[in-house]
Amino acid sequence: MVKVGVIGLQGDVSEHIEAAQRALENLGVSGEVIWLKKPEQLEGISAIIIPGGESTTISRLMQKNGLLEPVRKLGEEGLPIMGTCAGLIMLSKEVIGATPEQRFLELLDVKVNRNAYGRQVDSFEAPVKLAFSDEPFPGVFIRAPRIVELLSDKVKPIAWLGDRVVGVEQDNLIGLEFHPELTEDTRVHEYFLRKAL
């Protein structure tokens, strides 16, 4: 049975839990999706989602709750991890605009710029092209970080807004600027969860 953990310290956790549950149903896979708050819950985990929210807060709480190092180790060992918006920041190797106390997982070979699109008023929705589907995906961008550079050949673009890369994949990792959980469309979650099957 697949066990998916959504890091539930801050951010849009319940939406990700619902999206992952729907995606598992669509894939015909039995599994559970849990609200992941402490290291003990990582036992038997099949995949992890790091949701959007505020990256400074998520970073601080992951350190405080003892999740940062165990999650990094699991990512290095090949466990599927998807980060959306602030979760992308948490996965990234380099972060422009990070505060000195922020710690990141540094698993994904990308450089991102925090809050590159500006404040809440600059949030928008636009069709995103996916590498694994012909139909456009409804991309919801909320104070999104921006992928400014791919730092190695291991990183493959999987989502584009116009000609700009807004989603990447590196082996077991997926990082997205946008919020797939804020739509009824589960294609991105299904694509990610196939890594755990």
UniProtKB/Swiss-Prot annotation:
| Subunit comment | In the presence of PdxS, forms a dodecamer of heterodimers. Only shows activity in the heterodimer.
- GO terms (BP aspect): glutamine catabolic process; pyridoxal phosphate biosynthetic process; pyridoxine metabolic process
Give the intrachain disulfide bonds.
none
Protein family membership: Belongs to the glutaminase PdxT/SNO family.
Q: Name one GO cellular component term.
A: glutaminase complex
Which residues act catalytically here? C85, H179, E181
Q: Give the record's keywords alphabetically.
A: Glutamine amidotransferase, Hydrolase, Lyase, Pyridoxal phosphate
Which residues are involved in binding L-glutamine?
A: G53, E54, S55, R114, I142, R143
Tagged with keyword Hydrolase: yes
Question: Keyword Hydrolase on this protein?
Answer: yes
- InterPro entries, A to Z: Class_I_gatase-like, PdxT/SNO, PdxT/SNO_CS
Q: Pfam families, alphabetically?
A: SNO
What does UniProt give as the signal peptide span?
none
Q: In which pathway does it act?
A: Cofactor biosynthesis; pyridoxal 5'-phosphate biosynthesis
PROSITE patterns this protein is in? PDXT_SNO_1 (PS01236), PDXT_SNO_2 (PS51130)
Could you tell me what reaction this enzyme catalyses?
A: aldehydo-D-ribose 5-phosphate + D-glyceraldehyde 3-phosphate + L-glutamine = pyridoxal 5'-phosphate + L-glutamate + phosphate + 3 H2O + H(+); L-glutamine + H2O = L-glutamate + NH4(+)
Q: What is this protein called in UniProt?
A: Pyridoxal 5'-phosphate synthase subunit PdxT
Question: What molecular function terms (GO) are annotated for this protein?
Answer: glutaminase activity; pyridoxal 5'-phosphate synthase (glutamine hydrolysing) activity
Q: What does this protein do?
A: Catalyzes the hydrolysis of glutamine to glutamate and ammonia as part of the biosynthesis of pyridoxal 5'-phosphate. The resulting ammonia molecule is channeled to the active site of PdxS.
What Enzyme Commission number does this protein have? 4.3.3.6, 3.5.1.2
The portions of this protein that span the membrane are none
